[in-house]
């Protein structure tokens, strides 16, 4: 009797957790698209009263003297991908989500070519893609070694 009640409570908790993950993924996805397509930096406008300045969470990841990978882009796409992949991990939509995240990471950066006050940068693109790929690797490792 008690275990039946505990099972029901655990199922409800899992459903709520999944709903919150899905809501978080879609909310962050919408916010990311708005921030990416805005001409200039909304954070720069707010923090520095200058829409041309992009705040940095940490310094970029340096690959060589001439090249770096944008850390901000890595962090944002890592978080978005983690929410999306782990929200949909036990559904038929997981492959779609992975493809969507990879395409989103590429398309949003390519759109900077035509958006005023924005510029396409290879380091940003690689930061986006690496954020997604790192979460995919974590998801694959989790699936191999951890029982749901």
Residue map of PLM features:
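Bulky hydrophobic segments
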Residues: 2-125, 129, 133-146
